[in-house]
Amino acid sequence: SLLLAYTKKQFLDAYTTTVFDNWAVSVHIDQRNYAVSLFDTAGQNSYEQIRCLSYPHANVFLVCFSLVDKKTLESCRTTWLPEIRKYAGDNVPVMLVGTKNDLLENSESQNVVSEEYAKKVAAEIGCLKYFSCSALTHKGLKLVFDESFLAGVGVKFEEEPPNPCCTIL
């Protein structure tokens, strides 16, 4: 999991997905400290009704796909972005994140997603930015989260919480 790699600085080959995982981290941005909640939700269709409950108060979304599996990028376009916009609206920033960039060097598969194509899809589906990273090597990982925190800090809700915080889903 990308969130496990970021929060615990570890990579598990046999990570078992759950319906809903969350982590809390403290982040220092622009001379302010923020309590950040990070959520990972199950991707199976049968969990949409549960998953959507966490969308309305997210400050930013990371929509992830595998750089070595084009089908996962198409799922971002056909499933994840429409679902996010349906339940969270059009104003919440979305970052498109290509994962497993450590596998690109040794992959000769037709399923590999080029950076150019990923950026094109990100623009087409209305993502604020595109990043690639690796949970295994941590290459690009900090940048993904730093930029996401910065994007999420600017999101305003009708009722602001008393303490500065950011929720990334």
Which residues does each predicted region cover?
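Polybasic, Ser/Thr-rich amphipathic helices
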Residues: 162-169
